Amino acid sequence: MSLSTNQVRVPLELVMNVLDSAYYDDEPESNVQLFTNCALVCKDWSAIAQKLLFRRVTLRSQTDYIAFQQAVDRSTARGRMLGDAVRSMRVTLDHNQPYYLSQRSFARAVTLCPNMQDLRLAMYGQGSPGHDVVGAPDVNRMKRAAPSFDERTLALLRTGPSIASLQFSNWSDNSSTLFQLLDVWPALKSLAISGVPPQLPNEAPQPFPCALDSLRMNFQTPPCIDFMRWLLHNSTDSLRTLELEREPTPDMLKYLLAHHAGALQSLAMPTCGGHEGTAAIRQCRALRELRIESPWTPPTLCKALPETMEHIAFGVDMATPLPPILQMIKRSETLKAVTVHIWHGGESHPQLNALKIACARQGVELMSTTDVREFRSIALMVFASDQRDVIHSSTSVAGVIY
């Protein structure tokens, strides 16, 4: 009696659901390894796995671009499938690299991805031959010029997808590139800008037309209020998320919250500057999430927060005053999550167990970490779970099977 050799094929719909569920946004390298292996299982799995691999791509050199261009060649069905799968692209423009990605190639790569929603672009100033560390955003490099985008490159970008999210890190002294990029994409909803603070040109352009939903800033020195007024002219009623990775000046914080507190739902800052900071935050009556990285939180802050709060994230060291936070947790009917960044000595705080008990009794999820980068990521993910679908991670094309 012979054994049956009939094979039962797993339905493709089930395979798609399983692989899509396995996609891990926060560990792009693990995605490369996982889906490269999945692509080798069989022909049916290969197309599904490769589409997931191409969901987020990274281009750092002309070599990367050539490989990517060949893979997404739109004259072939496979190329169109992979190009259509791209949702997020991370690009580095650095003329100091041996085989750097040209601006024209960057623009062509964007046009090959009609469904792309998110672009993360880093630009570095061009220096004379020397002892540069490639990709290092040090002070000297930030004083170097980077070429502006030429008209042909800008025209190419305008023929590409209408992206919703732009992250631009400018490590050069050329402020015009930011204004060029913002002029290309008139439908942006999310903007993250860092590096050298932009300067408005002498002949100020028309106010930025986009109604932004989210803004994140991390400049070496504070931008001028005139720039913020220009950038957020049409975002008074739309800005829901504001993330300031460096401490703003009192005047800047006062200006931002005076004009945007009404719609703001998520606010992140390194510190809360005493009475002035508390008074500014008090204006945010629709706030759902607050993240303060400093281990010192003014005791009056918790009383200033609205009843709409769902997530609070803060730092803890040995001297952090926790009683006001404990009281807020106990009385809140809307709080869903608490995130704690444990600073040096914070693990020995005498009221840390009381915090755990208060969260457990109220059914509030408590998360903690000693890594500030993980702290920021956790805080963002909590609010993102039901508010955002913008992509913020990437996968290198180097691991894709061509």
Where does each model-flagged region fall?
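Leucine-rich solenoid repeat modules
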Residues: 2-6, 13-25, 279-402
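Amphipathic, non-transmembrane alpha-helical secondary structure
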Residues: 12, 16, 20, 66-76, ...
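Short regulatory "switch" loops immediately downstream of catalytic or recognition motifs
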Residues: 18-26, 33-35, 121-130, 195-197, ...
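Leucine-rich repeat
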Residues: 70, 95-266, 270-282
